[in-house]
């Protein structure tokens, strides 16, 4: 086994020879086959109903210290009274290492910083899985990576079941009965309706992860039937695709009994006061997730403790989670990989290829504290051009002229032909990791079809010819093309490229694009912003081009499907409606919209597969995005943890922190360390500092 592992590592580090592309460079062709990748983990596929169920058990258990220090002292009701009528039960047969034991910590390292805890109003908690551990959603999709394709539907979560009307236009959702927020307040339909009516539908509020009314279908409505029942009404029949949008991160309700105290509709405050009413220093915010924030030290650490009212159990009735505490060390994203490999951190999504080689070397050592498992090539980067020609983002005259170019197919072809994707990939990491990616769907999704993926091979001279065709020539001899004399005084074409400065991969790709576009004759300048500012600029339409790491719709197709095209005024990443206006879609975009809407409405698997072939061909032929590179990610996890699913991708329906189902991850008793900062303590009252004994 050791020899095999070392040989596999050696083959990855050495790499493989490049393949030849036999085609006339100026002609579109099918994208080249990707190099084989021998280290990809194998997934064990299961049926959807083998993962969990809802039912009452004869008895329930909790950590002994909770019983002794809190229940017997009268500080908490008995565990059976804290659980819902029928808790969610994770089936032992789907747990790789079976039912676990209580104790220990999972130590995360992140590069983000928390704005506050108001997820519903758009505040980030710092990413890295903090929000995933705190906020639960109506449905759940991350574990679906292991579900057989013909059984693909979201898992129940806060919504334990749902029924369709005979005509398929109404969906009745049954919520878990008797579940409670972490402060003991009941969870019910009022929390769901507050999120929908006073956050998603309120145009002055922008929930984190971008939920809009269109996310759930144009004209969709939601109403409360009773305390534990809500009813959706859709314009189309049986739009099962919207069940995926009810998972992370677009339908994860917050605690209405707390949030209403700051919302303008109920408290007479401003929207800014609502958004910022629960800053990072506000501890013990009630959650439905497995862990509650109890400590925060700026630029140091966030600590979360187990939720005593968590509504999930194992088959023996042990209240989850098994892990008592989560740590989030506030550092950098690159340091996350370093600490996970070194053993001072416990988990990392190895998504920055610059760290691949060193991580492989260290993980190959028998004494390494962490194991490293690669998944499919689902980490991809596109360059998105701003397609709005009618004012999204209030562009000035220069930006308007650039957008006019962006809407020209020959210009887009010139740009994509000028991209040397092989060099971009090798600048990140050498070896069989990166692959040529022309844009469109990820090669890691089951809907990917190579023969439908059109590729314009690298051809700098052909690209320059296309620039001349659209009227761009270097008229002043400085190496950069100029606008025609009648536009902006014939000055140099200057394009601003938006990029996230928090990630080295994003920066490296952006810098590579600046150099490659300079050879084409386009002056590209970087607008490097931290993650929060970069996202704000994106949502506001303040960019010409932007580097964008692919989100779930490209990796899974069934998650966030409306975002594959401008199906609504605020669904596309690079083409949205201006305030009070409409999206001025181009002909190829209308084709994409029609295809995506048909896909959402269809329940025929063969038809859906064919529709995504059409989508891929239209998107890549028309250069809807400029694909840059694609590569696999690897899950780095400390060897002391059990119940890590084999082959778990770091990103498909969601990130690995959700994919591995952290609430059922455990550390065997003989492997547990002394890492808890607040042992035998539970969250205190909302707004009070720290946990309680």
Swiss-Prot record:
<dbReference type="GO" id="GO:0030288">
    <property type="term" value="C:outer membrane-bounded periplasmic space"/>
</dbReference>
<dbReference type="Pfam" id="PF00496">
    <property type="entry name" value="SBP_bac_5"/>
</dbReference>
<dbReference type="InterPro" id="IPR030678">
    <property type="entry name" value="Peptide/Ni-bd"/>
</dbReference>
<keyword id="KW-0614">Plasmid</keyword>
<dbReference type="InterPro" id="IPR039424">
    <property type="entry name" value="SBP_5"/>
</dbReference>
<dbReference type="InterPro" id="IPR000914">
    <property type="entry name" value="SBP_5_dom"/>
</dbReference>
<dbReference type="GO" id="GO:1904680">
    <property type="term" value="F:peptide transmembrane transporter activity"/>
</dbReference>
<keyword id="KW-0813">Transport</keyword>
<dbReference type="GO" id="GO:0015833">
    <property type="term" value="P:peptide transport"/>
</dbReference>
<comment type="function">
    <text>Involved in the transport of alpha-galactosides. Required for the utilization of raffinose and melibiose. Probably acts as a periplasmic substrate-binding protein for a transport system.</text>
</comment>
<comment type="similarity">
    <text>Belongs to the bacterial solute-binding protein 5 family.</text>
</comment>
<keyword id="KW-0574">Periplasm</keyword>
<keyword id="KW-0732">Signal</keyword>
<keyword id="KW-0762">Sugar transport</keyword>
<feature type="signal peptide">
    <location>
        <begin position="1"/>
        <end position="20"/>
    </location>
</feature>
<dbReference type="GO" id="GO:0043190">
    <property type="term" value="C:ATP-binding cassette (ABC) transporter complex"/>
</dbReference>
<protein>
    <recommendedName>
        <fullName>Periplasmic alpha-galactoside-binding protein</fullName>
    </recommendedName>
</protein>
């Amino acid at each position: 086994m050791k020899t095999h592992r070392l040989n596999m590592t050696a083959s990855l580090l050495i790499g493989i020879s490049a393949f030849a592309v036999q085609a006339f460079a100026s002609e579109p062709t099918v994208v080249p086959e990707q190099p084989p990748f021998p280290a990809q983990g194998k997934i064990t596929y299961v049926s959807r109903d083998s993962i969990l169920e809802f039912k009452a058990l004869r008895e329930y258990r909790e950590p002994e210290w909770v019983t002794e220090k809190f229940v017997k002292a009268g500080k908490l009701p008995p565990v059976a009274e804290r659980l819902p009528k029928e808790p969610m039960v994770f089936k032992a047969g789907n747990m790789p290492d079976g039912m676990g034991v209580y104790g220990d910590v999972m130590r995360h390292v992140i590069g983000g910083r928390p704005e506050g805890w108001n997820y519903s109003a758009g505040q980030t908690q710092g990413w890295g899985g903090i929000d995933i551990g705190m906020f639960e959603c109506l449905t759940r999709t991350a574990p679906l990576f292991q579900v057989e394709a013909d059984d693909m539907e979201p898992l129940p979560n806060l919504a334990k079941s749902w029924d369709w009307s005979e005509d398929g236009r109404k969906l009745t959702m049954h919520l878990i009965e008797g579940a409670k927020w972490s402060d003991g307040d009941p969870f019910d339909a009022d929390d769901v309706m507050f999120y929908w009516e006073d956050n998603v539908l309120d145009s002055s509020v922008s929930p984190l992860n971008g939920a809009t009314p269109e996310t759930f279908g144009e004209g969709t409505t939601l109403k409360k039937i009773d305390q534990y029942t809500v009813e959706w009404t859709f314009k189309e029949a049986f739009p099962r695709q919207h069940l995926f949008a009810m998972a992370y991160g677009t339908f994860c309700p917050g605690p209405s009994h707390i949030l209403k105290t700051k919302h303008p509709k109920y408290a007479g405050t401003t929207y800014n006061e609502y958004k910022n009413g629960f800053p990072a220093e506000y501890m013990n915010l009630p959650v439905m997730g497995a862990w509650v924030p109890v400590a925060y030290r700026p630029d140091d650490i966030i600590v979360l403790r187990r939720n005593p009212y968590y509504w999930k159990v194992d088959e023996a009735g042990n209240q989850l989670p098994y892990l008592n505490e989560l740590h989030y060390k506030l550092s950098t994203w690159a340091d996350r990989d370093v600490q996970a490999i070194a053993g001072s951190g416990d988990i990392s999504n190895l998504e920055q290829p610059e760290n691949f080689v060193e991580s492989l070397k260290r993980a190959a050592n028998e004494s390494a504290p962490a194991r490293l498992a690669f998944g499919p090539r689902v980490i991809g980067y596109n360059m998105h051009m701003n397609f709005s020609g009618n004012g999204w983002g209030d562009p000035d005259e220069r930006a308007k002229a650039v957008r006019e170019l962006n809407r020209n197919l020959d210009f887009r072809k010139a740009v994509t032909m000028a991209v040397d994707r092989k060099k971009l990939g090798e600048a990140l990491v050498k070896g069989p990791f990166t692959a040529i990616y022309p844009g469109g769907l990820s090669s890691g999704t089951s809907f990917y079809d190579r023969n439908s993926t059109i590729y314009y091979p690298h051809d700098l001279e052909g690209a320059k010819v296309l620039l001349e065709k659209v009227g761009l020539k270097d008229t002043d001899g400085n190496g950069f093309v100029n606008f025609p004399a009648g536009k902006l005084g014939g000055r140099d074409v200057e394009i601003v490229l938006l990029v996230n400065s928090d990630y080295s991969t994003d920066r490296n790709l952006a810098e590579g694009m600046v150099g490659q576009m300079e050879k084409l004759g386009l002056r590209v300048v970087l607008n490097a912003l931290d993650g929060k500012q970069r996202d704000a600029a994106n949502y506001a339409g303040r960019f010409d081009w932007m580097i964008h790491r692919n989100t779930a719709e490209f990796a899974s197709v069934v998650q966030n499907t409306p975002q594959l095209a401008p199906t609504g005024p605020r669904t596309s990443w690079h083409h949205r409606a201006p305030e009070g206006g409409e999206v001025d879609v181009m002909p190829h975009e209308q084709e994409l919209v029609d295809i995506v809407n048909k896909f959402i409405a269809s329940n025929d698997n063969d038809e859906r597969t064919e529709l995504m072939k059409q989508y891929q061909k239209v998107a890549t032929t028309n250069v809807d995005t400029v694909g840059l590179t694609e590569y696999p990610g690897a899950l780095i996890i400390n060897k002391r943890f059990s119940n890590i699913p084999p082959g778990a991708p770091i990103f498909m329906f969601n990130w690995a922190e959700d994919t591995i189902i952290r609430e059922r991850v455990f550390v065997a008793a003989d492997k547990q360390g002394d890492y808890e900062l607040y042992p035998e303590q539970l969250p205190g009252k909302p707004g009070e500092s720290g946990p309680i004994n």
